[in-house]
């Protein structure tokens, strides 16, 4: 049973404050074993700086409600006209209510259908070809159409130990989220259909 009945809500009008990210968890019987959405990263690779990148930044901030950070080129590629250190992409990381809010809208853009190959241990990635497919977004001829990638990371309570500054430690193998659990989370909690290979 999905955590939210999508037939009763309008994804074009929903706001992050209307959602509670704690409801979007997969209960596995023990409070420390429950699985939840850790983060949703939205990435746009533009491949060039300048006006097109600024337009993409405007589109991304409208989509996510956050100011994107600029991603820089790691090396110079003369054929593409890219210099090292030049901004060529955008990234926004969303957490908690904003993450669930954006993920529901992004999944609606792909009809709540994902390929089995998109899943690995605790992570899911998928792309959207045109940002206007996302409910609530609008087409602006002055900006154009951009595609983007969505990367979702799932976690369990206690995962913070691998990111904290003091007394950092690895998460045990048995406590990590497996690929099967990731697929089950998306099917049971978000109501996603999985396309087999």
UniProtKB/Swiss-Prot annotation:
InterPro entries for the chain: Ribosomal_uL5 (IPR002132), Ribosomal_uL5_arc (IPR022804), Ribosomal_uL5_C (IPR031309), Ribosomal_uL5_dom_sf (IPR022803), Ribosomal_uL5_N (IPR031310)
Keyword NADP attached: no
Domain of life assignment: Archaea
Coiled coil residues, start to end: none
Any one GO molecular-function label of the UniProt entry: tRNA binding
Keywords assigned by UniProt, alphabetized: Ribonucleoprotein, Ribosomal protein, RNA-binding, rRNA-binding, tRNA-binding
GO BP terms, alphabetized: translation
Record function comment: This is one of the proteins that bind and probably mediate the attachment of the 5S RNA into the large ribosomal subunit, where it forms part of the central protuberance. In the 70S ribosome it contacts protein S13 of the 30S subunit (bridge B1b), connecting the 2 subunits; this bridge is implicated in subunit movement. May contact the P site tRNA; the 5S rRNA and some of its associated proteins might help stabilize positioning of ribosome-bound tRNAs.
Subunit record text: Part of the 50S ribosomal subunit; contacts the 5S rRNA and probably tRNA. Forms a bridge to the 30S subunit in the 70S ribosome.
Family, per entry: Belongs to the universal ribosomal protein uL5 family.
Alphabetical list of NCBIfam families matching this protein: PRK04219.1
Protein name from the UniProt record: Large ribosomal subunit protein uL5
Species the sequence originates in: Caldivirga maquilingensis (strain ATCC 700844 / DSM 13496 / JCM 10307 / IC-167)
């Amino acid at each position: 049973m999905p955590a939210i009945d999508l037939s009763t809500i309008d994804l074009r009008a929903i706001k992050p404050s209307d959602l509670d990210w704690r409801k979007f968890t997969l209960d596995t019987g023990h409070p420390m074993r429950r699985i939840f959405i850790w983060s949703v990263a939205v990435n746009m690779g533009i491949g060039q700086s300048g006006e097109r990148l600024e337009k993409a930044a405007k589109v991304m901030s409208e989509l996510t409600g956050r100011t994107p950070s600029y991603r820089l080129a790691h090396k110079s590629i003369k054929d593409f006209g890219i210099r090292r250190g030049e901004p060529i992409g955008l990234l926004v990381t969303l957490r908690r209510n904003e993450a669930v809010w954006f993920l529901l809208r992004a999944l609606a853009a792909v009809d709540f259908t994902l390929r089995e190959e998109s899943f690995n241990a605790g992570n899911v990635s998928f792309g959207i070809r045109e940002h206007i497919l996302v409910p609530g977004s609008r087409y602006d001829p002055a900006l154009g159409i951009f595609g983007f990638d969505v990367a979702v990371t799932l976690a369990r309570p206690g995962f913070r130990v691998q990111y904290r500054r003091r007394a950092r430690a690895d998460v045990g193998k048995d406590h990590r989220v497996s690929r099967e659990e990731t697929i089950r989370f998306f099917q049971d909690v978000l109501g996603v259909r999985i396309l087999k290979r």
